[in-house]
């Protein structure tokens, strides 16, 4: 059973703005916001003000820490060389087996 040979299920809903029932040139619709919601505007008197910081003092910065001490890099230790040789041997062994 192929889904390509079946008729469409239905007509898609109408697209676009505004939806049916709203006049095209009226936004927001009449009666908005619904009753019970306060009208938006300025905050009430006494609301904490979010102004600029006080002038005359620099803003606080994070403390400055000295850079970490640099470690002297030693020459490669024998452990590194032994690890490389072991990996090389493993690769050769696997290559010989497979």
Swiss-Prot record:
The UniProt entry lists membrane topology as:
Single-pass membrane protein
Q: List the biased-composition ranges (Low complexity).
A: 37-55
Indicate, by first and last residue, each region the UniProt record lists as having compositional bias (Pro residues): 9-21, 56-70
Top-rank taxon, per record: Eukaryota
The protein's predominant localisation is membrane
Q: From the UniProt record, give one GO term of the biological process aspect.
A: megasporogenesis
Q: In which tissues is it expressed?
A: Expressed in floral organ primordia.
Transmembrane helix as a keyword of this entry, yes or no, is: yes
Task: State what protein this is by name.
Answer: Cysteine-rich and transmembrane domain-containing protein WIH2
* Source organism of this protein record: Arabidopsis thaliana (Mouse-ear cress)
